[in-house]
A protein has these predicted regions:
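Charged, alpha-helix-enriched surfaces in structured cytosolic catalytic cores
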Residues: 5-8, 12-15, 19-22, 39, ...
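Conserved catalytic network of the ASCE P-loop NTPase/AAA+ motor domain
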Residues: 18-22, 45-49, 109-111, 149, ...
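N-terminal accessory targeting/assembly segments
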Residues: 1-49, 139
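Glycine-rich phosphate-binding P-loop
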Residues: 117-142
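Residue-level signature of catalytic and energy-coupling elements of molecular machines
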Residues: 32, 75, 130
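Switch I (effector-binding) loop of TRAFAC-class P-loop GTPase G-domains
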Residues: 9-14, 36, 135-158
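Canonical P-loop GTPase G-domain recognition
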Residues: 54, 60-121, 139
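Conserved, well-folded catalytic cores of nucleic-acid-processing
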Residues: 20, 34, 47, 78, ...
């Protein structure tokens, strides 16, 4: 007997991402700074098709700063991505994300040509908190249980 473990919502999300991949300029993957390797989506590399990626290590205040920096260096060197460690106590750090993303695709950062990013990550890594921080208001529902946000949303961030 062969048992498959691949929840339907994950399959649906992957299919939806593949349908809009051609519209995405930069991927923003949110990881938990306490366990970056365990909180990454192993399918992201395949899904993003070589497009630029910013890996945001959230909850950095709960992780060892030296280990977080080591993870950032490793991710940047091995995966060729940019990284940023953020905390909810210092929202100014997260507010750098739009400028970082624009620098990753300079041809899209011109007036009238917005950068189209996709924020993604496994449940409970801080995606909704990051969106709320970037917008400066609560637009994405936040909870301490997985799958509070169950669908893709289009949100304009300056």
């Amino acid at each position: 007997m062969l048992i498959h473990w691949y929840p339907g919502h994950m399959h649906k999300a992957q299919r939806e991402i593949r349908e809009i991949i051609h519209k995405i300029d930069v991927f923003i993957e949110v990881l938990d700074a306490r366990l970056p390797d365990s909180s990454t989506n192993p399918l992201l590399e395949e899904i993003r098709e070589g497009k630029p990626c910013l890996k945001v290590l959230s909850k950095a205040d709960l992780a060892d700063p030296d280990i977080t920096q080591a993870w950032q260096r490793a991710l940047e060197k091995i995966e060729g991505v940019k990284t940023l460690a953020i905390t909810t106590q210092q929202p100014g750090i997260a507010k750098q994300i739009p400028d970082i993303v624009k620098s990753m695709v300079p041809h899209r950062g011109m007036p009238g040509k917005p950068v189209r990013s996709m924020i993604m990550g496994i449940p409970n890594v801080g995606k909704s908190t990051l969106i709320n921080t970037l917008l400066g208001r609560k637009i994405a529902k936040v909870g301490n249980e997985p799958a509070v946000t169950k669908r893709q949303q289009k949100i304009l961030i300056d």
